[in-house]
Regions:
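Catalytic center-proximal scaffold of phosphoryl-transfer enzymes
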Residues: 2, 108, 142-146, 151-522
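Short, flexible loop/hinge motifs at secondary-structure junctions
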Residues: 1-174, 242-243, 249, 269, ...
Length: 522
């Protein structure tokens, strides 16, 4: 409310109160302006770590969208030092070798004394070569048979016999499993949109329309539907599921404008040594999505503070929600960014909070370096992290009573204290980390791809993308090469009939050696 002279009180104490209130409001507005300027013009990376050496993971705390922008902005800064010549890594032994001999002329193999020179060794220099993609046509020939003696009649059975066509991932199309796998990996693993792939094929003299390739992706994903049911079960088989979501624009959704925002969800779970990464397309950010995916699951679920996740514990008492220290830290970093230049180098409450978080991550670094087992990690945290957390909590309890609630510091403190019961649950299990980075890292390939293809042209395409991202990222997490896995999968899944057949095609049940042998024999 704007005050005029005739409405101002005469009491000096009331005037002082008005000035203080206005001053607080101005401070909040200035913070908001600086944060907006930082978002538009400033760098996206978080460089406010109190102790860089002790907090390696803290630089992973940005959301996936910000991390993608940060990767594009990185600059290499090399401090002064005595430069050592880097050693070149040897080329992989499994690559085929082609030998080219560079020998002297036979007339030069004579010594000055007249004797013939003997070969005493050789110098070998290996250089890397590449042959562009090899495209071939596979002709499927099915001989026809008929009796020339009686020529048969239809009532006695078929007059012409021919072998049935083999099951194919694209039954009536020209695409082989290898081609479908190549297109899928190029789009979903390498972020190469179909319109660019169309141009690449055109350079080889092959006319493949992008709409045709999009249809192949949908058909391939539909063929993998029974396999995805097993992927959902595998997701529930571990002690922890990390969840995150990111916007996706999908065109031609029934009853919705093309500008309406949809979402791609990601779930990271399954056995710790053979993780599952599951993508799920939805028109909504409602908590109904994680409730459906995690129905029947019992264990920890780590998320950010989005309110849609709160109903998980209510709908499923077996789920225990865990908070994310990444978001806590990000709120305090935002305060430093919002300071004016005069106050930027003056340590204050944000630096104190970041120091506490840095100490927590030093403990996590020790656990990684010692390669501790989950039970040993719990013991280490109980001994060293718990005292830090108690001290951090006591400091915040005291500080929040002295801080305006609407300012950035008040918001950061309130966020941390509200989430505190969930934040400290990582102490209970050695498989849990203090942050939700597993989900944010899992969703990053999709975010990179979205920057190139921008939107999905149809809900069927969005569902297909979710399926293929799930299979590719799960294969990568299990140590498999994405193309090799999809090539084998698309070759064998049309023949699968039982649950046992489908289960054998899960990334968790395959090894790199099996894939290499299959590709070599294909």
């Amino acid at each position: 409310m704007q005050l005029t002279n005739d409405k101002l009180p005469d009491n000096p104490e009331e005037l002082k109160a008005i000035i203080l209130c206005k001053d607080e409001h101005i401070t909040i507005l200035e913070e908001q302006i600086r944060v907006l300027k930082k978002a538009i013009f400033g760098r996206k990376s978080e460089k406010h770590s109190v102790d860089e050496e002790g907090s390696r993971q803290l630089h992973l705390f940005n959301e996936a969208e910000v991390l993608v922008e940060q990767e594009a902005q990185k600059k290499l800064v090399i401090p002064e030092h005595t430069r050592q010549k880097p050693k070149r890594k040897p080329l992989p032994k499994e690559l085929p070798r082609v030998e080219v001999i560079h020998d002297i002329d036979e007339s030069e193999r004579v010594c000055q004394c007249g004797a013939e020179l003997s070969r005493i060794g050789e110098e070998v220099c290996e250089k890397l070569d590449i042959i562009p993609a090899k495209i071939r046509v596979i002709r499927h020939i099915r001989p026809k048979y008929a009796c020339r003696s009686c020529e048969g009649v239809e009532s006695d059975g078929p007059t012409v016999k021919i072998a049935p066509p083999p099951p194919q991932i694209i039954p009536k199309g020209i695409a082989t499993p290898g081609l479908v796998a190549h297109i899928a990996v190029s789009k979903y693993a390498d972020a190469l949109p179909l319109y660019r792939q169309e141009k690449i094929f055109s350079r080889y003299g092959i006319e493949l329309n992008r709409s045709t390739m999009a249809g192949w992706m949908v058909k391939a994903a539909e063929c993998c539907a029974p396999l995805m049911e097993l992927v959902y079960k595998e997701l529930h088989s571990g002690p922890l599921v990390n969840v995150d979501e990111t916007p996706l624009q999908v065109l031609n959704e029934p009853g919705r404008a093309n500008t309406t925002k949809s979402y791609m969800w990601v779930f990271h779970g399954g056995p710790p040594d053979k993780p599952v990464i599951l993508f799920r397309y939805s028109q909504t950010r409602s908590g109904e999505v994680p409730r459906e995916v995690l129905a029947g699951y019992g264990g920890y679920c780590q998320t950010d503070a989005f309110s849609g996740y709160d109903a998980l514990e209510v709908a499923n008492p077996g789920i225990i929600l865990v908070g994310c220290f990444a978001h806590v830290r990000r709120n305090f970093v935002k305060i430093i960014d919002a300071r004016g230049r005069a106050a930027r180098n003056k340590p204050g409450s944000p630096e104190v909070a970041l120091e506490y978080i840095s100490r927590l991550y030093k403990i996590e670094k020790i656990a990684r370096e010692r390669q501790l087992l989950p039970d040993e990690i719990v013991s280490l945290r109980s001994q060293h992290a718990m005292p830090v957390l108690k001290e951090f909590k006591a400091w915040m309890d005291k500080r929040i009573g002295q801080t305006p609630p609407k300012g950035l510091l008040g918001q950061a403190l309130n966020y941390a204290l509200t989430q505190w019961p969930k934040l400290i649950r990582y102490l209970e299990n050695g498989h849990i980390t203090p942050d939700n980075n597993a989900a944010e890292n899992a969703i990053r390939p999709f975010v990179i791809g979205r920057k190139n293809f921008l939107f999905a042209g149809h809900p069927n395409g969005a569902n297909a993308a979710a399926t293929l991202y799930s299979l590719i990222e799960t294969a990568k997490a299990c140590g498999l090469q994405a193309y090799q896995y999809l090539r084998l999968l698309f070759e064998k899944i049309p023949h699968a009939q039982s649950e046992r057949d489908y289960k054998s095609l899960l990334p968790q049940n395959l090894t790199p050696e099996q894939l290499s042998q299959f590709i070599a024999s294909a």
